[in-house]
């Protein structure tokens, strides 16, 4: 999104999409680091003619590592790995070592940054929309496909009120999702609509829209900060553990609650884990 990694157009893609080889290679590296034992236990079960260097006896760890050494093939490696992880049956001739694939957790933070134009430029020096980056397009497409995780799993996509480009279309799309969950139909006058003459991005508006007469599997959960009472109980945990050497009173809790952006638990935790050390002067 920030325009800091290499990118290139994918030949033959329509509409034109762009791949980010270095970023894809980095994701493959983190995927292996976090799931090495699992990936090493699963054998390749599909045919990947675009990866001629891949041996039929390879594990999924071996497959992912192909994208480490050569970022030029990292996108094809990622696509092959995704095909393997979502496979429900082996390809002909590869039945011997096939094992059922586990459920997957796909987590995306800062979703709002994917709803605007990126810092990348096309050959005509026009801004490239984030949805035209193959990486982004892949993960957003999972929200539209009811069987995107064929072996089960969870899509957890998050955005926040801070560090947010505040795209109008995403706000409307989320309001519409909340309205549908509340039982408000799209034909109701209460159903959220873009302001008149607004330039809300239609691609973003359609992102969370279910197919006609279909029930969307996407669910909206709104999370807020802790109340002052909840924050006090949370901070008392650190005080009783000995990590926090402070007198927990209403004034102190109120101050830290405000400094944490209204009880954001991650910010409160920073205060709780902050160890105060005192040094005595030597005589």
For the regions a language model picked out, list residue spans one by one.
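P-loop NTPase nucleotide-binding core
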Residues: 1-92
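Eukaryotic short linear interaction motifs
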Residues: 3-8, 114-116, 164-166, 230
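Amphipathic alpha-helical protein-protein interaction segments
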Residues: 17, 67-74, 125-132, 220-224
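Alpha-helical repeat scaffolds in large eukaryotic proteins
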Residues: 83-86, 90, 112, 116-119, ...
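Short basic/glycine-enriched coil/helix segment immediately N-terminal to the Walker B
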Residues: 90-103
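Sensor-1/coupling segment of RecA-like P-loop NTPase cores
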Residues: 100-101, 112-115, 121-206
């Amino acid at each position: 999104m920030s325009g800091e990694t290499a990118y290139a157009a994918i030949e033959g893609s329509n509409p034109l999409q762009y791949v980010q080889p270095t970023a894809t290679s980095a994701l493959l590296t983190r995927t292996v680091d976090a799931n090495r034992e699992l990936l090493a236990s699963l054998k390749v079960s599909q045919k990947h003619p675009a990866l001629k260097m891949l041996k039929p006896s390879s594990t999924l760890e071996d497959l992912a590592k192909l994208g480490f050494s050569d970022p030029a093939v990292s996108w094809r490696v990622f696509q092959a790995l995704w095909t393997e992880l979502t496979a429900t049956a082996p390809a002909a001739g590869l039945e011997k070592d096939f094992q059922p694939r586990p459920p997957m957790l796909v987590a995306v933070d800062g979703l709002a940054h994917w709803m605007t134009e990126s810092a990348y430029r096309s050959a005509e020096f026009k801004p490239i929309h984030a949805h035209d980056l193959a990486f982004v397009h892949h993960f957003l497409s999972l929200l539209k496909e009811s069987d995107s995780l064929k072996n089960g799993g969870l899509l957890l996509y998050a955005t926040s009120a801070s560090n947010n480009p505040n795209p109008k279309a995403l706000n409307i799309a989320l309001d519409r999702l909340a309205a549908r969950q509340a039982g408000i139909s799209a034909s109701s006058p209460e159903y959220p609509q873009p302001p008149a003459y607004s330039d809300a991005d239609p691609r973003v508006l359609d992102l969370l829209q279910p197919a006609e007469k279909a029930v969307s599997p996407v669910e909206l959960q709104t999370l807020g900060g802790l109340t002052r009472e909840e924050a006090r109980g949370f901070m008392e945990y650190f005080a009783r553990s000995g990590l926090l050497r402070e007198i927990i009173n209403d004034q102190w809790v109120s101050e830290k609650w405000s400094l944490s952006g209204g009880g954001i638990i991650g910010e409160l935790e920073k205060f709780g884990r902050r160890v105060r050390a005192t040094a005595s002067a030597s005589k």
